[in-house]
Amino acid sequence: MAALDIHQAIARAQAEYVRCIDDGDLAQWPDFFTAECTYKVTTADNHRRGMPGAMIYAASRGMLADRVASLRDANIYERHAYRHLLGQPYVVSADGGEARSETSFVVARVMRDGSTDLFATGRYCDIYAVTDSGVKLRERIVVCDSSRIDTLLALPL
């Protein structure tokens, strides 16, 4: 896949990913990942220091599906929705069947009572599996700018 095509494929995948979350279609969220994948939400400080700690960690698409099932059926949390704003993906590298990118994000949280607040800012550090049919996330590290993370981190970022 040519460099421009990879950039466009990643930008489209990013748009579809946040639309899925923002529209509440969480059952489809694991489909953006390869079967063997990593999803991690961490702080910029932990990421910079190479610390393994994470607020959310999953090591496979099955673990992501389990998270969605628990959000739907088991966890008790105040219902809310997200609205993502994304920067353009920056393709760090692309060779063979893999592409690495970074994308800045801002997430607003909308509560049931209608109140809206700035929930998280940061960047996605991604590794994509690249095939002729498109791209899928092999690894997504969500690096939050702040070390102050709200305890209501239920939905995926």
Residue ranges and their predicted role:
Residues 8-11, 20, 55, 62, ...:
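A generic "alpha-helical surface" signal
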Residues 17-19, 72-79, 112-115:
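Short helix-to-loop capping/linker segments positioned immediately adjacent to catalytic or ligand/cofactor-binding
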Residues 27-28, 84:
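A short glycine-rich, hydrophobically flanked beta-strand micro-motif that places a catalytic Asp/Glu
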Residues 35-104:
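A solvent-exposed, acidic/Ser-Thr-rich amphipathic alpha-helical stretch
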Residues 1-25, 31-35, 42:
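Short, low-complexity N-terminal intrinsically disordered segments enriched in polar/charged residues
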Residues 81-85, 90-157:
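A beta-strand edge to alpha-helix "cap/lid" segment located at domain peripheries
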Residues 17, 29, 64, 101, ...:
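Hydrophobic pocket/interface hotspot
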